[in-house]
C-alpha cells in the first residue's frame, strides 16, 4: 500500500489561528510564519496524506492555558479530532468533565518547556484524571521522567509520553530518564508517541542517530502501546520538516504490519475511533 494512501491517525499535532484566536499577551512565545497552522489548512494536509483522524495538542507556545482554538477545531471537525488540553493545576473535576464532553481526552504537562518545579502541585489533578479515565500526557526531556515516575506510579494515572521520551542520547542507555521510561513501559500504565525525532537528534534529518532508541521504544512498549505522530507544524523548529518526508522516513524504519499498528489499530483503540 502506498504510504500516503494508508489510513492513519496522527497522534500529536497543533493548530494555531492567531487571526481568529489571538495569542494571549502573557504567553512569552508567539509562533509566526510557517509555524502557524490553522485547523482548516491542517484538514487539507490530512486529506493529502490519508490521515483520517488526529489528536490535537494544546500548544504551550502561543496559547498556554487558552484552549479556545483547540476546542473550536474539535467542534468544527466532526469526528476527525480529539484533544489534549492545557489547564491550571487547580482545575476542578467538574471542569475536566466539561472538557471531556467537548472532545478532550487528556491534559498536557510539558516539563521540557516549563521545568519540573512548575508542576509541583499536580497530584490532585493527576488523581482527577485517573478517576475520569483521562490521559496525563507528559513531554519530558533528558532525565526529567526520573522525578515524575514515582508520582505516576503512586497515583496510577494512565500516561502518554511525547516524542519517544526525548532522551539526551549522549547520556547513553543507562541514563536515569531512560530507566524510568522502561519502568513505565513495564508497568502497563504508559503509551508512547513515535514522533519528534528532531527534538532529540544530534545530527538532524534523517535522524539516523535516533534510530536505535526508536527501535528500543518500539520493543519496550510494544505495538499495542506505540502511536505514530507528526508533531505538525513543528513549533520552534530550526529547520524545515515536511509531513511527507516524515511519513517516508517512518516507512523505511518499520514493516507494514508495524505501520498498521502504530498508525491505525493502536491509536484507534486508545483514543476511541
What is each stretch, according to the model?
Residues 39-43, 67, 71-74, 93-97, ...:
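Generic structural signal for well-ordered alpha-helices
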Residues 26-77:
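Alpha-helical scaffold segments that flank or form the walls of functional sites
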Residues 9-13, 54-58, 81-85, 107-109, ...:
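Hydrophobic faces of well-ordered beta-strands that scaffold small-molecule active sites
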Residues 61-144, 193, 197:
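Active-site gating/metal-coordination segments in enzymes
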Residues 1-9, 32-53, 215-216, 221-227, ...:
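Mid-to-C-terminal alpha-helical segments outside catalytic/metal-binding sites
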Residues 105, 119-227:
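Catalytic pocket-lining loop regions of alpha/beta-barrel enzymes
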Residues 12, 46, 70, 99, ...:
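Conserved, mostly hydrophobic/aromatic
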Amino acid at each position: 500500500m502506498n504510504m500516503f494512501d494508508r489510513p492513519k491517525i496522527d497522534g500529536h499535532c497543533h493548530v494555531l489561528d492567531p487571526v481568529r484566536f489571538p495569542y494571549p499577551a502573557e504567553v512569552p512565545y508567539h509562533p509566526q510564519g510557517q509555524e502557524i497552522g490553522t485547523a482548516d489548512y491542517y484538514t487539507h494536509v490530512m486529506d493529502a496524506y490519508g490521515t483520517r483522524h488526529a489528536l490535537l495538542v494544546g500548544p504551550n507556545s502561543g496559547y498556554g492555558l487558552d484552549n479556545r482554538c483547540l476546542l473550536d477545531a474539535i467542534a468544527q471537525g466532526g469526528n476527525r479530532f480529539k484533544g489534549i488540553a492545557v489547564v491550571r493545576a487547580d482545575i476542578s473535576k467538574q471542569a475536566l468533565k466539561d472538557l471531556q464532553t467537548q472532545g478532550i481526552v487528556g491534559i498536557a504537562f510539558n516539563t521540557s518547556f516549563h521545568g519540573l518545579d512548575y508542576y509541583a502541585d499536580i497530584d490532585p489533578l493527576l488523581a482527577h484524571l485517573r478517576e475520569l479515565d483521562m490521559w496525563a500526557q507528559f513531554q519530558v526531556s533528558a532525565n526529567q521522567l526520573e522525578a515524575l515516575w514515582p508520582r505516576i506510579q503512586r497515583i496510577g494515572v494512565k500516561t502518554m509520553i511525547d516524542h519517544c521520551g526525548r532522551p539526551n542520547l549522549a547520556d547513553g542507555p543507562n541514563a536515569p530518564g531512560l530507566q524510568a521510561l522502561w519502568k513505565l513501559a513495564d508497568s502497563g500504565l504508559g503509551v508512547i508517541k513515535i514522533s519528534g525525532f528532531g527534538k532529540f537528534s544530534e545530527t538532524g534529518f534523517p535522524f539516523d542517530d535516533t534510530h536505535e532508541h526508536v527501535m528500543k521504544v518500539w520493543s519496550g512498549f510494544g505495538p499495542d502501546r506505540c502511536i505514530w505522530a507528526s508533531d505538525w507544524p513543528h513549533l520552534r523548529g530550526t529547520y524545515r520538516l515536511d509531513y511527507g518526508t516524515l511519513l517516508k522516513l517512518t516507512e523505511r524504519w518499520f514493516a507494514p504490519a508495524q505501520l498498521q499498528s502504530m498508525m491505525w489499530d493502536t491509536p484507534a483503540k486508545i483514543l476511541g475511533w
